[in-house]
Amino acid sequence: MNCSGVLALFLSSLLIPFSTMASFYDPVDGKFDMGHHIAENVTGFLPIPILITEPAVGYGGGVAGLFLHESAEEKRIRKEAALKAIDGGAQLVPSAMSVVGALGTENETWFVFGGHRRSWLNDSIRYTGGGGFGVANIDLYKQFSLGNKELNLKFGTSTSVAGLSQKVQFRIGDTPWMIGLKQLFAKSKVESDNRLVDKLMEFTLGTESVTSGLGIEAEFDTRNNLFYPTKGYRFSADYMVFDEVIGSDSNYRNLNIEGEGYIPVSEKWTLGLAGNYQNYEQGDGFVSPTAKPYVELRGVSSFRYQGDEVETLQGQLSYSINHRWKVSGFYGSGKATERADQSNKVNAGGVGFRYQIARRYGLHLGMDYAQSHEERAIYFNIGSGF
């Protein structure tokens, strides 16, 4: 049994009677599996240990619980499919799921969160929402020119925030396309350990600020599994407007385009590709320093490379040892560009593994090790890692 399986089993044993331990083994292959427990128990859920080595916040951890809500008929269909084939049931998307969790790190960053996704009419209408509150202590970087020299200013920030994000989507006929509306609302307070920066933010943003945004989104999705796809594509584009008219203290716009694809190279090998482009337009002279988009790659600190334009490209090659175990190698490149023609590029790569912990749902849990030229980190992931 793998280490993630042992940890998940231990956490689960604290919540359920010992007599139900047999439900943690798959009836088809006899391996450790939590699919039966999630589906057949009223309080069944997947406990997800959170191991944090994010360079931006330091070492830490937490725990999350993933609840998959299905009707009796949906459970019956999934169970029958899982008993007939090794990959049976994994292509069926649960009509509703929820997640709750909490985490904390050594630099006193902490967060409590929850989310829910629900679909109706055979996934013709879909709602996704989530919220949380906590404190994030992170370093931010600002690049500027002084004469012929390019200088980087580093300053610590502490952001206390409570926020809500939600969206509703509607399917276009029987196609893989969905269109919808998005909303984001957050109330935050940002402080800095740099006295000059702190006074500047207090003067321009006030002691507290409200972020309120509305937007539109289009999404195309043909992936064969929501959690760990091995075939198919996903493309999405959204445009968010943050404006005083809808209650925001800051005025800015953000365009976000992202895509990912999974190409079976052979029976054992799968090639994954992912890309992201963001374009940020600032209407006010001053906004919260965390509002700008940043390069998001495994092995790179969050908010380390921010810009008005952000581009990332990633590739991942996965090998299936068997239907339970997967190993992978990945590499990515990112670029953050400011309006003043200043840009930063960063490359990062690493290796990882996954264990299929709930076969009838296609849920994979595992770890990634990644590093860039100046940082390294370990990630405890559920899903592909993109």
Regions found by a protein language model. Name each.
Residues 45-47, 96-100, 125-129, 177-181, ...:
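Transmembrane beta-strands of outer-membrane beta-barrel proteins
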Residues 54-56, 70-72, 121-123, 173-175, ...:
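Outer-membrane beta-barrel channels and translocator barrels
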Residues 44-46, 60, 109-111, 159-163, ...:
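Transmembrane beta-barrel architecture of outer-membrane proteins
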Residues 269, 340-348, 356-386:
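Predominantly the C-terminal beta-signal and adjacent terminal strand-loop region
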Residues 207, 214-321:
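C-terminal outer-membrane beta-barrel translocator/porin domains of Gram-negative envelope proteins
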Residues 38-45, 51-206, 291, 307, ...:
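Gram-negative/organellar outer-membrane beta-barrel architecture
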Residues 17-19:
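N-terminal signal peptide c-region/cleavage motif recognized by signal peptidases
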Residues 70-72, 103-107, 134-138, 186-190, ...:
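Sequence/structural signature of outer-membrane beta-barrel proteins
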